[in-house]
Amino acid sequence: MSETITVNCPTCGKTVVWGEISPFRPFCSKRCQLIDLGEWAAEEKRIPSSGDLSESDDWSEEPKQ
């Protein structure tokens, strides 16, 4: 028999069963899922990078010839 895997909701910390019975996994609810999405949309969360490439001289919208 397989062991039940549980994780903590990243928003509120409640225990969530990792399986089809938890449609919002890893979140415990649609509310927690939307809170997390809002944090990403408001740029409160981000994936760390080694530097700011947006100001790089290597970026150009003109094709190289």
Curated annotation (Swiss-Prot):
- Annotated region Disordered: the residues are 45-65
Its required cofactor(s), as named, are:
Zn(2+)
The annotated regions of Acidic residues compositional bias extend over: 54-65
Which Pfam family, just one, is annotated for this protein? Answer: YacG
Q: Which residues bind Zn(2+)?
A: 9, 12, 28, 32
Q: Which GO terms describe its molecular function?
A: DNA topoisomerase type II (double strand cut, ATP-hydrolyzing) inhibitor activity; zinc ion binding
Q: Does the keyword Repeat apply?
A: no
Q: Which UniProt keywords apply?
A: Metal-binding, Zinc
Q: Does the keyword Metal-binding apply?
A: yes
One biological process GO term for this chain?
Answer: regulation of DNA-templated transcription
- Return the cofactor note field: Binds 1 zinc ion.
- Description of how the protein assembles with itself and partners: Interacts with GyrB.
PANTHER family for the chain: DNA GYRASE INHIBITOR YACG
Function comment: Inhibits all the catalytic activities of DNA gyrase by preventing its interaction with DNA. Acts by binding directly to the C-terminal domain of GyrB, which probably disrupts DNA binding by the gyrase.
Family, per entry = Belongs to the DNA gyrase inhibitor YacG family.
Kindly provide the name given to this protein in its UniProt entry. Answer: DNA gyrase inhibitor YacG
Organism source for this protein?
A: Escherichia coli (strain K12)
Q: Name the lineage.
A: Bacteria, Pseudomonadati, Pseudomonadota, Gammaproteobacteria, Enterobacterales
Gene that produces this protein = yacG
